[in-house]
């Protein structure tokens, strides 16, 4: 579905990505991990069109999207959430999600956009009493739900999730994990960046590890956790799937 071929990106003298080869297969939940500054968010930004690669290319459904702007990448079926929760603060939650419904993929346009926005807010678990509340009056957890609903409103084929569990309690994290599983069941392929290894290892079909902008490992969660290089530069110790 998605293929990055030799993708490199520099910011001044800093090589954020170094000839990264990377794939995401249809219907999988793929994980992208690595130390801070390893290039994870930069790679998501290249895929979503925020940054253009200095070399290499990004293919989506066998089409080169490397030079497309973010709104055109979105129109192809790739939508990204951000680490920092973003919204239109003076618009209601419903209006925020409507922006996604109205400006999503052309073939996915709805006959009743308001009802679609309501359904998505219900799907992500936002209280109906908050539908007509300005986004600036929501807490962080509620804003994350709205951001996710707005992303889903564009009818993505591939959803990029950048650290969606940041700032959540264990209970809220469990709810978010269940929601990610439900999204995949709806036929959406997912690529997620996350620092909570227990989540990545429990959710993902395949995991890719970046370090200093280079891919150092790729495989099943168990293969990645047992890779000596990954343990050395990132995990610190071998990850146990049976730890509480």
Regions found by a protein language model. Give the residues of each.
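Glycine-rich phosphate-binding loops of nucleotide-dependent enzymes
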Residues: 1-244
